[in-house]
Amino acid sequence: MNRFWPPRPSHTVLSVSLPAASPLLGSFAANSLRRVAQIAEIIRGYQDLAPDERNDRAKEIVQLRHAEAAAMEACADVLDCDASATCLRLRAEALRGGSWPERVERCIGLDETRLISLSGDLHTWHNKSREVFHSALFAAVDRRYDRLVEDLDGQIDALTCYIQTTLNPRLIVRPPALFKVGNLIFCGGEANRYPKHFAYFLPEDEGIKRARMKKTVVFANVYSAIYHGISAPFGSSALVLEGDDDQTAAPSVKDYLICWFRGHDIGHGVVLPETDFRVLGQQGRAASMMLQEVMADLFGLLLVSGGPWSGLANLRSDVAVKVFLNEMLRYLRRGETYFPDAEAAFLELSFLELNGFVHVDFDRRKIMTSVERVLSGVTQMLTLLAGTALANDVEGTKAVIDRYGSGARAQFSSKFRASFGQSTEVLDYVQTV
């Protein structure tokens, strides 16, 4: 299988240096984890062999998995965080043949304060392959963002009131998945191929569906590198945001990314009492996924551009909107036929453009709007989707897709692609002990 996705004539590789692991974890732990990532690369390479060749390597692959497990257990012995050490040991047991679902699910509820660990089977991009492939990832927990997310989550009741007042008094917020933020230090296997993931949804991305507990893991350094290396440069050339002042000091963009993504996570659980996503599934799996991503994206922006989070995290609506638009355009330029997130980004831009909240000048390659127009459009879009997709209105939801989706607006999609091109940038990690 090609290391790169989606298919492109060429890719632009951006080199990103991951933090040195020894100052964070100590030399012994760092070298142990580097060994795991290196072994994961070998195992993943064997998975690309023809079936007969792979079978010939079966015994060696088992030995390699055991070597990974031994290195993870050695690291666990020197960590000063019981939860981080327990996760390593549970995943080591799974690599040796222990019950995979049982051990992985036990890891989900752990509150690591030093190290986030993933190893073993992991999904890749949905349209790249439906199979799971071998990976190993390790990230140092970012305690500042851990505390920030804890503070944000403490505002759920206030968020619910804000959403009800802004959109619909019948909307409720389901308890969100657990959330852990770290800075990636080692990566091997399928996860080290292209494009890189800045987040994983566990244990679903490990092939375990309908788990009792779920956790979102975000790599803040990777997310920031994607934004500053891909999203922001394109946005600065194409986006004209009325009143934007690059000279005005603003909090770290990384704060906005983490807060928006937590808002996105929470947005997946904003529903009406009667919402049944099986009804939404009648639109087809791809359309259902796309609409759920649209709503999560928009709820995320709503939460970081106003309401209780703004004061708590010192967030400004103008910066929040700019970051959101830059990310929306990055997702869209990946190609809506390859990623549900890109299809969602297309519908978002399509709605904003068709209803006059955004103007796209294809000749000048400019996308023009204002903070106020975007927020007004987002509120209108969420109100529409709450009354259709969340209200189990099959015909109303179909009408939204038929009016704003890429199938209905093929000419707009084609003109956008011809004018603004598609993203070819991917990250490559420089990993050091």
Predicted regions and their residues:
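Post-HEXXH active-site segment of zinc metalloproteases
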Residues: L272-V294
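Extended, compositionally biased alpha-helical segments that mediate assembly or anchoring
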Residues: R144, A391-V433
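Active-site recognition of the HExxH zinc-binding catalytic motif
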Residues: Y256-P273, A296, L301
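Long, well-structured alpha-helical subdomains associated
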Residues: L301-R403
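N-terminal helix-rich structural modules
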Residues: M1-V104
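Short, glycine/acidic-rich hinge or "gate" loops at secondary-structure transitions
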Residues: S84-L88, L171-A177, V279-G281, W309-V323
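Contiguous, non-catalytic segments that form substrate-binding/exosite surfaces or channel walls
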Residues: H66-D246, V253
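An active-site-proximal "capping" alpha-helix that borders the catalytic cofactor pocket
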Residues: C81, M289-G306
